[in-house]
Regions:
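H-loop/switch region of ABC-family ATPase nucleotide-binding domains
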Residues: 206-207
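Helix-to-loop junction immediately C-terminal to a conserved catalytic motif
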Residues: 53
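The feature captures the beta-strand-to-loop junction immediately N-terminal to the Walker
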Residues: 38-40
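Conserved ABC transporter NBD signature motif
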Residues: 61-69, 229-231
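A short, flexible loop at the N-terminus of ABC-type nucleotide-binding domains that lies
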Residues: 1, 10-24, 74
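ABC ATPase NBD coupling module
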Residues: 15, 69-83, 91, 113-120, ...
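ABC ATPase C-loop
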Residues: 162-163
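Conserved beta-strand-loop-alpha-helix hinge in the C-terminal portion
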Residues: 226-252
Length: 264
């Protein structure tokens, strides 16, 4: 499904600010894989997501999705088949538009429809039914501007918008980090349910080591712009946060330097 081969990315090459963000990075995901990614600050996690999403082109290597080479496909074209959620719950929705209008835009874009088309009554009922699955009462507030929603409600809505037409790939970039613990747990439950029920191929960056081991079917750890650990199956089932950290240190000779990760 997703096949990344030997991509590298250096920012500001040849200057005092030169930064090697990705180094000969390779990754293969099968359809329906749900892989969590952890790593210290500067490990290359966000750069990886930006490369996959098409925010910039990698210096070397290739990226294929569903058998199609997208290495040089523009970002706006990739967004039709790649869904993405960011850490900031305000990123991903139009605050001055209603819930219904936000859903309509997401639906028409993902289904390759005309964004200026009228939404049918059947589509509106579909939106209402999908909103009810969030269990937040949003199905009764479809005419309300999104800017009036809480951060958790907006993030749940963004998740729904990104998956209402299942994408070929879903990128979750610490999408619950800015939420309070109770809301974060609810959004994570929604995430796991939607991803598993729709068999969506998913990559999720998290700072929470427990989440990294409990969610999905693979855990990847990054350092210095490449994967240093990839655990799945029985090895992952028997792994604890302590053993994950110890394995990272043994494999890299480094300690995790992000206190927020270690304390989660």
């Amino acid at each position: 499904m997703l096949d990344i081969k030997n991509i590298s990315k250096t920012f500001n090459p040849g200057t005092v600010n030169e930064k090697r963000a990705l180094t000969d990075f390779s990754l293969h995901l099968e359809r329906g894989d749900f892989a969590t990614i952890v790593g210290s600050n500067g490990a290359g996690k966000s750069t990886l997501f930006n490369a996959i999403a098409g925010c910039f082109y990698a210096d070397t290597g290739s990226i294929s999705l569903a058998g199609r080479d997208i290495t040089f496909t523009p970002e706006h074209q990739r967004s039709r088949v790649i869904g993405r959620l960011f850490q900031d719950p305000l990123h991903g929705t139009a605050p001055h538009m209603t819930i219904e209008e936000n859903l309509a835009l997401a639906y028409l874009r993902a289904s390759h429809g005309n964004p200026f088309s009228r939404i049918s009554r059947a589509d509106k009922e579909k939106f209402r039914a999908q909103l009810s699955l969030l269990d937040m009462g949003l199905e009764d507030r479809m005419r309300q501007p999104v800017g009036l929603l809480s951060g958790g409600q907006r993030q749940a809505l963004t998740l729904l918008m990104a998956t209402m037409v299942p994408p070929q790939l879903l990128l979750l970039d610490e999408h619950t980090a800015a939420l309070d613990p109770a809301t974060a747990e609810k959004v994570l439950e929604l995430t796991q349910r939607i991803v598993e029920e729709s068999h969506i191929t998913c990559l999720m960056v998290t700072h929470n080591m427990t989440q990294a081991l409990e969610l999905g079917n693979r855990t990847l750890m990054m350092a210095d712009g490449h994967i240093v650990m990839d655990v799945s199956g029985k090895e992952r089932e028997g792994m604890t946060v302590d053993s994950l950290v110890a394995k990272f240190k043994a494999g890299t000779g480094k300690a995790l330097d992000n206190d927020r990760m270690l304390l989660s």
